[in-house]
Amino acid sequence: LMGGYEIIDLASLLIDKRLVKRLGGSNWKTDRIEAANIWAKEHGRAPFEISEIQWSLAHCTPRTWGDDTLVCMTEEERMWYEKQNMPVMCFAPQAKGLFSKLLAGKEETLSTTAKRRFLTTENLALAPKVQALCQRLQVSPAAVAMAYLTSQKNPTIAIAGSSRIEQITETLGGADLTLTEEDLLFLQS
């Protein structure tokens, strides 16, 4: 595993040549980002300014993904991003439609991959909370899942993919939805 300082040093060449303006990392834990950024500051180099990791309302782990190189958001990591106000690009923000399918009574339509990654006791216990927010706010589960990310204190970008127009419509249907601090705490409790 190449050290963060080595990557910062090499990436600085791209900035010096004006090939890129800013640096970001994918699947880096916050302690590695922090160490690289400290080194960058001490050596007059550009720091990492954005991170891309797996983050969704649905809890998952590298083990459930079957990929120990993957970084999934944890509460400790989330607090670091919030404190640093560092933007996070969140991949798989809809957890393969987990809450939309669960709340529609279509658990059987979840793919084998979705079941392995996201169909956990913890996420099943979260489904009634998602449903309660959907009913109170009159929005879809997809809207709640996206708003959970975009309502965080640090900037977030949810990288949502879809295979059908209906999925895009459902995801974007709550694009302007902002959850309150109380809503976020309700989902996290």
Regions inferred by a protein language model and the residue ranges of each:
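Beta/alpha (TIM)-barrel catalytic core signal, keyed to glycine-rich beta->alpha loops juxtaposed to Asp/Glu
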Residues: 1-188
